[in-house]
Amino acid sequence: MPLSFERFQGEGVFGLSSSSFYSDSQKIWSNQDKTEAKQEDLGYVVGGFLPEPTSVLDALRSPSPLASYSSTTTTLSSSHGGGGTTVTNTTVTAGDDNNNNKCSQMGLDDLDGVLSASSPGQEQSILRLIMDPGSAFGVFDPGFGFGSGSGPVSAPVSDNSNLLCNFPFQEITNPAEALINPSNHCLFYNPPLSPPAKRFNSGSLHQPVFPLSDPDPGHDPVRRQHQFQFPFYHNNQQQQFPSSSSSTAVAMVPVPSPGMAGDDQSVIIEQLFNAAELIGTTGNNNGDHTVLAQGILARLNHHLNTSSNHKSPFQRAASHIAEALLSLIHNESSPPLITPENLILRIAAYRSFSETSPFLQFVNFTANQSILESCNESGFDRIHIIDFDVGYGGQWSSLMQELASGVGGRRRNRASSLKLTVFAPPPSTVSDEFELRFTEENLKTFAGEVKIPFEIELLSVELLLNPAYWPLSLRSSEKEAIAVNLPVNSVASGYLPLILRFLKQLSPNIVVCSDRGCDRNDAPFPNAVIHSLQYHTSLLESLDANQNQDDSSIERFWVQPSIEKLLMKRHRWIERSPPWRILFTQCGFSPASLSQMAEAQAECLLQRNPVRGFHVEKRQSSLVMCWQRKELVTVSAWKC
């Protein structure tokens, strides 16, 4: 969705002066060591020149690592999705008459207005790109539990943001062994005791976010026997991925010729699998394997990009996977600095994705409904969200609107204020940090508009790697309800047990999880690559079915970066871990059933989508959104 950069020029993204935007010396927005050229690159947010942000690139540690710093703001958030054509007979379909009855009985006639794809027209604020009700960040009909309206509540301003650090830790070489013993209630390990800084203090630009040593030194992963079976839906049959008993076997696999790769999906799958297996040996400094993998991917990618003018979703997904694997070979772990214009394009792609696919709406509204139902009890003055994947913060706009609607007296028992604590990994570039601060300012602005008292605190997820520095004082009072948003792909699998143990001590009212079909930390890296191929093929199919003109920008600025991020994170923690649901159970959490209201809300949401092919399935205590019987995302709730 090409946007004119000039339309956003003027006073800046939020119409704030540079002095007010960066007045707080505690924030990471002044870097005296950067060159003037880099200042000019990031200085213009959208209009006037702003000081260069101090970032993780500054190797400075906080003089007071455990000092807390708070700030009042608002929230937005993110995800993926698609559009479709057929419906299964065994599940709830988008076009089911029963759904029409449910929606009518619940008084959901205004949902069309909420979910319309109306554009803000000539609005001159990037905030409107994200917060526009037409892009799934608006307000649900009150009957849905997401009412509109605002009360006479002001948004207090108190700054608090704790920045990130680079904190070494002791890795787990085999997390599965620790969980097999039933006496182990939760996998736990002790990292070094050097105190981590809370703030986004930093290291060097090229330092990995999580520096990991080889989890299996001296062992060549290419020689492992992988005998996993995976269904590949294109052929509607079980396929066994190649298993290599030696590096020679992998090296002997022929690279697909231009005449066969485009016609036989199994060949493409085989080559991607073999390349991924070879890439797993790069930690052992095996140059031969690197060269072999690079050759396979280069030739495969060249063919995929030149095979036809109109590529199928499978071909496009395979091409993105190949590009991501090549980036791993070249150690391109840090994305280049983004320009303000690219940032606008990424936000525009995010908005287009939310309008094109019901994915974001399904995740956000289902999670928020569960949070409201668990936290909306008499006596709670405030809801405290602990978020491990804030994105652009769009998830919380409807929640703030609902809280604002209760202030006027419609729902007097409802909490009237909101606090957000964001746990984020150390930004690997100035761009990551820039986006985080951009989101923070968006949230502050929106909280002021709906007049909801709202605080935000930014903490390093690395604080949770050492129990000695756990911020257990996050709960401010007994009248504060705590809800956790923990997408499965938001943290490295090796860190999940410690994070769950920390959350267990906080005793949250609810933990909400979203799980995409490609988040497979329990599979070896090559198999995880194929899972990602299958998942993103299905996602692109759903987007193609919508016939949206913005599909290319969505794919370039949203889907492709998602693939790169997924594979990079999975490759950094190459060792397999137990399925995440087992980890939750081992750490003392039990699944909580989602309500009938949440299920009916999801069904009506998909029913009103113009593309047929999406449907909702209820699997045990979870709700699953599928595209033509293929899982796109699952939302579940957990309690301790």
Curated annotation (Swiss-Prot):
**Tissue expression summary:** Expressed in seedlings, roots, cotyledons, leaves and flowers.
Locations listed in the record: Nucleus
Gene Ontology molecular function, alphabetical: DNA-binding transcription factor activity; transcription cis-regulatory region binding
Report one GO cellular component. Answer: nucleus
The primary location reported for this protein is nucleus
Q: State the similarity comment.
A: Belongs to the GRAS family.
Task of the protein: Probable transcription factor involved in plant development.
Q: Can you name this protein?
A: Scarecrow-like protein 27
Q: What broad taxonomic lineage does this protein's source fall under? A: Eukaryota, Viridiplantae, Streptophyta, Embryophyta, Tracheophyta
